[in-house]
Amino acid sequence: MALAAGLMLSLNSCMDDYDEPNTDGYLITSPESLGEVNYSIAELKNDNASLFSQTNAFEQVKEDKIIEGVVAANDCGGNLYQTLLIRHIDESKPEGDADRDQAIVLGVKHTWLTPYFQLGQRVKVNLKGLYIGCYSKLPKIGQPYYTSSGNLRLGPVLLQLCATNVELVGQPNPDCAECQPIALSPEWLRATANRNYLNYPQLVSVTGTIQEADGEAIFAPESLQDAGYGVDRTLVNSENNTKVTIRTSTQNDIAFTVMPEGEHTYTGLLSYYSNWQIQLRSVSDIQ
């Protein structure tokens, strides 16, 4: 009996050792609060207007500036590589105010971000130590890196910096307002005044017909990929011939999808370089 009791005590002791495993090593975001939000994406853009107006430029943030927003786009479909679209809607500001609905890209160097940053997940980001600026005119939070041609550009932050600079807030809510796209009219897309950093990046939907669709062609065959490993398709609106580029990287589900013929609505991340461009998040963004 004494031996049996001893064995049971030993077994219980071993089980207790494994009841609550230490999972700290599996966390990629801060396990502690970053503090109170003291800044907004709108303030970030307005305070750095000259920086965000450039094509390729960046600077490091030296102070504790904590912003908050919701993940409105991620790499769930494999098309937005190392990219999170962080969007914040300030309901205290009136409809039509440019500062009410602002977004920015947070680049994170990791092969698949979706398990950690699901659509509808609210996050805080402490900008201190990170870099802000533009990559090919796209407003972004990241870190500088050297391209293969030796140019210094704003790339994604290292994954380990998420543990000190990024905090998850609550649970993901994919039905939240920030995950609902803004429907852009042909008139809005044509207006030159809208082609500025306050209007992109953003989650939007556009309607039109893909010029290259023939019932067989797919979005992004490798045979057509450019130096950026992507393929551009042209979406045309029937009302006023407004054109938007749909850019798709190769080697993902969207890339191998046959482009639908006729008029459809496409949802994705909006940017602007020499023309308006959207990148779909997943195949379900085609309606």
Language model regions located:
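C-terminal motif of bacterial Sec signal peptides marking the signal peptidase cleavage site
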Residues: 9-13
